[in-house]
Amino acid sequence: EFQAMGELEYYVIAPDTGMFEATDQRGYHESGPYAKFNEFRTQCMSYISQTGGQIKYGHSEVGNFTLEGYIYEQNEIEFLPVPVEQAADQLMIAKWVIRNLGFKYGYNVTFAPKITAGKAGSGLHVHMRIMQDGKNQMLKDGILSETARKAIAGMMELAPSITAFGNTNPTSYFRLVPHQEAPTNVCWGDRNRSVLVRVPLGWAAKKDMCTLANPLETESYFDTTQKQTVEMRSPDGSADLYQLLAGLAVACRHGFEIENALELAEKTYVNVNIHQKENEDKLKVLAQLPDSCVASADCLEQQRAIFEQYNVFSSAMIDGIIRKLRNYEDKTLRADLDGKQQEM
């Protein structure tokens, strides 16, 4: 069974009261009164959970700034892994809940990929795991399993065309730039936020960390390897949720169908920050993600047969996605607006 969960990022925009100003771009897990919308997020989470959404937790995010008399505060609600169809449903309903509550309280809520240059954009990271008979197949003997590496290889192969489902308007490609909490190249790694597919904190340790910190607690024997996922970091709030999650399922399946999957996984693995100057040689050999909707459409055109296989995507649907992306005519937009913050 293919399971997934999303990390739903959004900005809340409201008039600036001038009180307890947060530090610019330092809003990660900030508390009140510097974070202004924790209670709003908590209420959103309550309603989402009442609709059946399975939530892990919520918190304020990196993006936090003021502009022209308004506060822009980024928040995130992170879900728990569920069957992929359910994952899409709960993200869709969550966006509906957040927008409606924002309207009720007079807040402007946006899931836009990028608001302005130099500030963190809003992504929609998707975590995935493969289950069989109730057991997580992502780890074996304490390390990432062959199953997981093949799934990652499929995502490496189809990463350029997945942007057609997960990055669907021109502002998406202003987010996919170095040093802005977003990926730029096709690679993966452990606990590495410069990569496209990240393997989060490993759960292979056979210690109950809670009892280490709290010696009087009764030791738990929960199998923590059940928590292991891999995280696709390119998608954003413009994504068509159902197309995106279907596309990721196709990509992981593709990893089991290609002969050189493990070699591809080995070739695209990195264990350094690829955007640091000392690692520029490594960066040069990695394929780049598309830099526009037009480029994304071209990638989907080249790889469409894989998505149409087994009738997961119809040819008419792929045609429509390609046509919509190309209609933006944004092939040179990112280069044209480079350094022109006001025009952006």
Positions of PLM-derived features:
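Glycine-rich, acidic/polar active-site loops that bind/position phosphate-bearing ligands
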Residues: 1-344
